[in-house]
Amino acid sequence: MAEKKGSSSEKTLYCSFCGKSQHEVKKLIAGPSVFICDECIDLCNEIIRDELPTGDAGREGRGDLPTPAEIKTNLDHYVIGQEKAKRTLAVAVYNHYKRLRHKDKAGKDEVELSKSNILLIGPTGSGKTLLAQTLARQLDVPFVMADATTLTEAGYVGEDVENIVQKLLQSCNYDVERAQRGIVYIDEIDKISRKSDNPSITRDVSGEGVQQALLKLIEGTMASVPPQGGRKHPNQDFLQIDTTNILFICGGAFAGLEKVIENRTEASGIGFGAAVRSKKQRSLTEVFQDIEPEDLIKFGLIPELVGRMPVVTALAELSEDALVQILTEPKNALVKQYSKLLAMEGVELEIRPAALKSIARKAIARKTGARGLRSILEQALIGTMFDLPNVSNVEKVVVDEATIEENKAPLLVYREAAKTA
């Protein structure tokens, strides 16, 4: 029963399975002398889903989503150390995207899974931003990074929080469906903390007000975004973006938070049975392991915002050995990058172990962490990279400890002789 002739000369097509005409269904798909309607296709999909064994259904639910172990392994290629943070992030991100797949297929009576946004706490240059970027790249989801210090309340000069959603849309070419499953990283979240425990008469347009605006975005709201990056004005059609399924990762150094934690833990450790341990004996990493939500509230984050970020993980301060590893081991390690740059000039780069340790010590002294490594190495090589295009027969550039510590020029090894300059 594929086709029948009506009173007119044109043919009316019918579904070969249910017999409905093309006018009774949304879509009719043609095969060799047969047709099937969209309703019959939906029915077939339901039958297949219902008859799948439990194990297969679980695998289908996960699809190509990497497991926490696979996510962590990928993070290991780019981020050195921070084992606890990587494991926590891997599980949180895996559960988030598993939750989205469950939500798509869940019935009305099934358990609803809540979103768990993430708060990363750690010193400058410890890898907070790199962790978020690497995650988004691995999962192939839209990613945007925002700076909390540029945000102000709506109506004031500066960016309002909906600009974050607009940037996320731009990153995926205004594909609303993809944007609604993206990742947003908000850096410097600690800089918008309340300046005082007491409410002020003056407006705090970049502090608590921004936290309140971010709260709505993080917990889930319909954000109105002008199409294709235009400015908001009346009588304009807006794109409506549901932020409920966007994963928010917030990061900050939280300088001074260690004092809040120490004051709380010391207050609870008073008495004859309390362990006596001086403040200097505990590193920043150790102190951050004792963090509680009440410490973040005391620091200046509003309780509602703290409650929307249940996954809190602290990143450790990077040691000298860890910084040396960062210089040499990751896929995009700085030494590999500069070696490639010099290789384009036909020159080999050698950075001696003592020089690597010296670079790491300088970064620690500057309190810039891994972020400061590039500027130290750039400073050591800038003169050589300026001269190399005009110098012939250079085979190798050698950076030793004196280059870093005493600002001496790197050694140049020439092809025709082993002389150095």
UniProtKB/Swiss-Prot annotation:
ATP binds at P123, T124, G125, S126, G127, K128, T129, L130. GO terms for biological process: cell division; proteolysis involved in protein catabolic process. The keyword Metal-binding applies. InterPro entries: AAA+_ATPase, ATP-dep_Clp_protease_ClpX, ATPase_AAA_core, Clp_ATPase_C, Clp_protease_ATP-bd_su_ClpX, ClpX_bact, P-loop_NTPase, Znf_CppX_C4. Zn(2+) binds at C15, C18, C37, C40. It comes from the Bacteria. Residues 3-56 form the ClpX-type ZB domain. Keywords: ATP-binding, Chaperone, Metal-binding, Nucleotide-binding, Zinc. GO terms for molecular function: ATP binding; ATP hydrolysis activity; ATP-dependent protein folding chaperone; protein dimerization activity; unfolded protein binding; zinc ion binding. Gene3D superfamilies: 1.10.8.60, ClpX chaperone, C4-type zinc finger domain, P-loop containing nucleotide triphosphate hydrolases. One of its GO terms (cellular component) is HslUV protease complex. CDD domains: RecA-like_ClpX. SUPFAM superfamilies: Glucocorticoid receptor-like (DNA-binding domain), P-loop containing nucleoside triphosphate hydrolases. Component of the ClpX-ClpP complex. Forms a hexameric ring that, in the presence of ATP, binds to fourteen ClpP subunits assembled into a disk-like structure with a central cavity, resembling the structure of eukaryotic proteasomes. ATP-dependent specificity component of the Clp protease. It directs the protease to specific substrates. Can perform chaperone functions in the absence of ClpP. Belongs to the ClpX chaperone family. This is ATP-dependent Clp protease ATP-binding subunit ClpX.
